[in-house]
């Protein structure tokens, strides 16, 4: 019997595959009618994340429909602040909300009980690894310390995360303590996901793009480096993707400085620059999600350009950020077919 291949893992090990493996950020999401039906049963969004029966189901839905090469655990980057009792809630039309943290709150943070609070997530991971096709890579994930901290400081998302940037300037010691704490507990969380059955993990730094050069080094690079070093100290073979959205030219040294195996690229990263980054190792991305909403020629030309420029090197095809609720599931079918059929 032929050995089962997990193509995403092969690329994370530096192999170039034609066609490249494909999965999509937020592939389990509101664009799918089956997701909306399951979501309606769940109660709150966090109930969906913490109920293994439901979290397993929504993770598997896009695999059944599209046979993506990877499944990504259905959860949220804000389960860490939820485990820290920050009263996290998701309000319709307003996004995430939580109790803002101050310097006293940072001084009082304790890691006790975080992993037990998140035990339903690990049950979901273990069940997914049993239920997924053998060839499907299972990805775990967490938020990067900077991005999680922005929500903890402001108590919500803001257009440019000015509250966290201001807090970092006014209270530099407390802010760096918060980032170090989040790096350590997030590393513990990723190790637990790997131990439960995740084949690889992704670190999402969705708000890296609001940082200046010096702040990027201190708040985006250093905490992620600390996380990855902590994971690798315990699980040396761990495969890690790091996605610093909006980082632009600061991605040049991001892989080397953080130790990530692969770097995620948003849709604004020029493909010529992406090709330079790919010389150092695998890249993931980077189709504009709006091309999937548009479909047709706009989507096809975007796919073809990425494959033309990056398809001969180690590439995991993905979007440049999460798929949006307006995307037509049929367009996603066409996307997958074109990625798998254009080359080779």
Swiss-Prot record:
Gene Ontology BP, a term: protoporphyrinogen IX biosynthetic process from glutamate
Keyword Transmembrane among UniProt keywords: no
Family annotation (SUPFAM superfamilies): UROD/MetE-like (SSF51726)
PROSITE patterns per record: UROD_1, UROD_2
Record-linked InterPro entries: UROD/MetE-like_sf, Uroporphyrinogen_deCO2ase_HemE, Uroporphyrinogen_deCOase
Family annotation (PANTHER family): METHYLTETRAHYDROFOLATE:HOMOCYSTEINE METHYLTRANSFERASE RELATED, UROPORPHYRINOGEN DECARBOXYLASE
Subcellular location: Cytoplasm
Function: Catalyzes the decarboxylation of four acetate groups of uroporphyrinogen-III to yield coproporphyrinogen-III.
Pathway annotation: Porphyrin-containing compound metabolism; protoporphyrin-IX biosynthesis; coproporphyrinogen-III from 5-aminolevulinate: step 4/4
UniProt organism field: Sinorhizobium fredii (strain NBRC 101917 / NGR234)
Stated family: Belongs to the uroporphyrinogen decarboxylase family.
Complexes and interactors: Homodimer.
Keywords: Cytoplasm, Decarboxylase, Lyase, Porphyrin biosynthesis
Cytoplasm keyword on record: yes
Sites annotated Transition state stabilizer: 76
Residues bound to substrate: 26-30, 76, 151, 206, 321
Catalyses which reaction(s): uroporphyrinogen III + 4 H(+) = coproporphyrinogen III + 4 CO2
Listed Pfam families: URO-D (PF01208)
EC primary class: lyase
This protein's name: Uroporphyrinogen decarboxylase
EC number of the protein: 4.1.1.37
Gene Ontology molecular function, alphabetical: uroporphyrinogen decarboxylase activity
Superkingdom: Bacteria
């Amino acid at each position: 019997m032929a050995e089962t291949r997990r193509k995403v893992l092969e690329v994370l090990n530096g192999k170039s595959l034609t066609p490249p493996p494909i999965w999509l950020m937020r592939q389990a999401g509101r664009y799918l009618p089956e997701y909306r039906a399951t979501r309606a049963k769940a109660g709150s969004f966090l109930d969906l994340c913490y109920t293994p029966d439901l979290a397993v189901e929504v993770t598997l839905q896009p695999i059944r429909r599209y046979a993506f090469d990877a499944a990504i655990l259905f959860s949220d980057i804000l389960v860490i602040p939820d485990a820290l009792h920050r009263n996290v809630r998701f309000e319709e039309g307003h996004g995430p909300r939580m109790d803002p943290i101050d310097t006293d709150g940072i001084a009082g943070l304790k890691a006790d009980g975080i992993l037990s609070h998140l035990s339903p997530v690990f049950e979901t991971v273990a069940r997914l690894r049993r239920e997924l096709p053998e060839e499907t890579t299972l990805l775990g994930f967490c938020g990067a310390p900077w991005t999680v901290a922005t929500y903890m400081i402001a108590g919500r998302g803001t257009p440019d995360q000015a509250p966290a940037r201001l807090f970092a300037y006014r209270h530099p010691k407390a802010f760096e303590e918060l980032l170090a704490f989040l790096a350590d507990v997030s590393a513990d969380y990723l190790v637990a996901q790997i131990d439960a059955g995740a084949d690889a993990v992704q670190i999402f730094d969705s708000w890296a793009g609001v940082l200046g050069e010096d702040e990027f080094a201190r708040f985006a690079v250093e905490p992620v480096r600390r996380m990855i070093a902590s994971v690798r100290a315990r699980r040396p073979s761990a495969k890690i993707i790091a996605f610093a959205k909006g980082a632009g030219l600061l991605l040049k040294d991001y892989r080397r400085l953080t130790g990530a195996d692969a770097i995620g690229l948003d849709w604004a990263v020029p493909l010529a620059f992406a090709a330079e980054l790919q010389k150092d190792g695998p890249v993931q991305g980077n189709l504009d999600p709006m091309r999937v909403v548009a479909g047709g020629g706009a989507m096809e030309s975007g796919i073809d350009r990425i494959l033309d420029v990056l398809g001969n090197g180690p590439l995991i095809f993905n979007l440049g950020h999460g798929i949006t609720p307006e995307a037509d599931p049929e367009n996603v079918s066409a996307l997958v077919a074109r990625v798998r059929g254009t080359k080779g």
